[in-house]
């Protein structure tokens, strides 16, 4: 029996954080056993914000090496760079013609990024969700692991697919949201009301996967908690967001249930919790970074993985695109 297909990707912009690892990459590794996984480095999405070309090339290979270091296996999963598979943009154009301007205007991420990058509000940024829809629908993905901030984009993907299918038959698989439970929402260290983001301008809010241990410890020990006297290490997202975030991180890294951690730190100071989090995160990252450098220093290996991944991805993508082209009435190339 064929495994259900999963598609997901990461932009090569900004450094990946422990939030990316605990909320996404670690779950992807586990999914390889039960799903046919297709993992992409989405460089076309990255250029909706201005990128330095040299930095973009480096970051693309960095993301690939991090995929491998985290445990994504090219023998089990298809791994490729988005721009290496032209069918993504070809399908995106067709889907544009079945997507309404009003739908795109309601996308909250476009509004947020437009405010942040007011000097470069480009059409690509506006059209980002349609390219994301093409990424997913091209591979007939059944499940898409996304964070809460991407739910709206997946919902519009489903709308576009249903609209197209209603006109032309069952061309596309309708994707479902897959949200991992453990570590799905790792929050900012200084502002635990918002999600940790690799694009955060305040670097004290994030711990990156390639950060040195001293910096990791420094940031975590400065993390926001609260002013309760005496301090109480208790999981309460509404009233103790900072403490809850540290417990989430520690639970995700150690696989210990939150309830067990609450008992472990009963009667202890917040400093004890922060030290434990810093130690566990540093140990995790030291091992991951060692594997990262082994892969990153072998660009021949990385190039081969990307070439083979693109070949596998294109074979599947071309099947879907051929069905779409036939459905809308394009003359097939001979």
Curated annotation (Swiss-Prot):
<keyword id="KW-0648">Protein biosynthesis</keyword>
<feature type="short sequence motif" description="'KMSKS' region">
    <location>
        <begin position="195"/>
        <end position="199"/>
    </location>
</feature>
<feature type="binding site">
    <location>
        <begin position="11"/>
        <end position="13"/>
    </location>
    <ligand>
        <name>ATP</name>
    </ligand>
</feature>
<feature type="binding site">
    <location>
        <begin position="195"/>
        <end position="199"/>
    </location>
    <ligand>
        <name>ATP</name>
    </ligand>
</feature>
<keyword id="KW-0030">Aminoacyl-tRNA synthetase</keyword>
<dbReference type="InterPro" id="IPR002305">
    <property type="entry name" value="aa-tRNA-synth_Ic"/>
</dbReference>
<dbReference type="InterPro" id="IPR050203">
    <property type="entry name" value="Trp-tRNA_synthetase"/>
</dbReference>
<dbReference type="InterPro" id="IPR014729">
    <property type="entry name" value="Rossmann-like_a/b/a_fold"/>
</dbReference>
<dbReference type="InterPro" id="IPR024109">
    <property type="entry name" value="Trp-tRNA-ligase_bac-type"/>
</dbReference>
<comment type="subunit">
    <text>Homodimer.</text>
</comment>
<dbReference type="InterPro" id="IPR001412">
    <property type="entry name" value="aa-tRNA-synth_I_CS"/>
</dbReference>
<dbReference type="Pfam" id="PF00579">
    <property type="entry name" value="tRNA-synt_1b"/>
</dbReference>
<dbReference type="GO" id="GO:0005829">
    <property type="term" value="C:cytosol"/>
</dbReference>
<dbReference type="GO" id="GO:0004830">
    <property type="term" value="F:tryptophan-tRNA ligase activity"/>
</dbReference>
<feature type="short sequence motif" description="'HIGH' region">
    <location>
        <begin position="12"/>
        <end position="20"/>
    </location>
</feature>
<dbReference type="GO" id="GO:0006436">
    <property type="term" value="P:tryptophanyl-tRNA aminoacylation"/>
</dbReference>
<keyword id="KW-0547">Nucleotide-binding</keyword>
<comment type="similarity">
    <text>Belongs to the class-I aminoacyl-tRNA synthetase family.</text>
</comment>
<feature type="binding site">
    <location>
        <begin position="147"/>
        <end position="149"/>
    </location>
    <ligand>
        <name>ATP</name>
    </ligand>
</feature>
<keyword id="KW-0963">Cytoplasm</keyword>
<feature type="binding site">
    <location>
        <begin position="19"/>
        <end position="20"/>
    </location>
    <ligand>
        <name>ATP</name>
    </ligand>
</feature>
<dbReference type="GO" id="GO:0005524">
    <property type="term" value="F:ATP binding"/>
</dbReference>
<keyword id="KW-0067">ATP-binding</keyword>
<dbReference type="InterPro" id="IPR002306">
    <property type="entry name" value="Trp-tRNA-ligase"/>
</dbReference>
<feature type="binding site">
    <location>
        <position position="186"/>
    </location>
    <ligand>
        <name>ATP</name>
    </ligand>
</feature>
<protein>
    <recommendedName>
        <fullName>Tryptophan--tRNA ligase</fullName>
        <ecNumber>6.1.1.2</ecNumber>
    </recommendedName>
</protein>
<keyword id="KW-0436">Ligase</keyword>
<comment type="function">
    <text>Catalyzes the attachment of tryptophan to tRNA(Trp).</text>
</comment>
<feature type="binding site">
    <location>
        <position position="135"/>
    </location>
    <ligand>
        <name>L-tryptophan</name>
    </ligand>
</feature>
């Amino acid at each position: 029996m064929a495994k259900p297909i999963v598609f997901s990707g990461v932009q090569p912009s900004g450094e990946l954080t422990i939030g990316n690892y605990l909320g996404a990459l670690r779950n992807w590794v586990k999914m390889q056993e039960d799903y046919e996984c297709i993992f992409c480095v989405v460089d076309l999405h990255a250029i909706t914000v201005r990128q330095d070309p040299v930095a973009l090339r480096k970051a693309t290979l960095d993301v690939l090496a991090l995929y491998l270091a985290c445990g994504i296996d090219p023998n089990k999963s298809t791994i490729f760079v988005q721009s290496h598979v032209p069918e993504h943009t070809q399908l995106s154009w067709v889907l544009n013609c079945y997507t309404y301007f009003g739908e795109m205007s309601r996308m909250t991420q476009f509004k947020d990024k437009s405010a942040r990058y007011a000097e470069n509000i480009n059409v690509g940024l506006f059209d980002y969700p349609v390219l994301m829809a093409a990424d997913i629908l091209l591979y007939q993905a059944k499940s898409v692991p996304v964070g809460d901030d991407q739910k709206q984009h997946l919902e519009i993907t489903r709308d576009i697919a249903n609209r197209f299918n209603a006109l032309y038959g069952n061309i596309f698989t309708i994707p479902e949201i897959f949200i991992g439970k453990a570590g799905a929402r790792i929050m900012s260290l200084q502002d635990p009301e918002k999600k940790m983001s690799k694009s955060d301008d305040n670097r004290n809010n994030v711990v990156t996967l390639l950060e040195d241990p001293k910096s990791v410890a420094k940031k975590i020990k400065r993390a926001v908690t609260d002013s309760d006297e005496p301090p109480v290490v208790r999981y309460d997202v509404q009233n103790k967001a900072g403490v809850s975030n540290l417990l989430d991180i520690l639970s995700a890294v150690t696989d210990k249930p939150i309830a067990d951690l609450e008992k472990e730190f009963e009667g202890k100071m917040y400093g004890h919790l922060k030290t434990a989090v810093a130690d566990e995160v540093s140990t995790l990252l030291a091992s991951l970074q060692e594997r990262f450098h082994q892969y990153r220093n072998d660009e021949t290996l990385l190039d081969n993985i990307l070439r083979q991944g693109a070949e596998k991805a294109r074979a599947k993508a071309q099947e879907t695109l051929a069905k779409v082209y036939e459905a809308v009435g394009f003359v097939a190339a001979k």
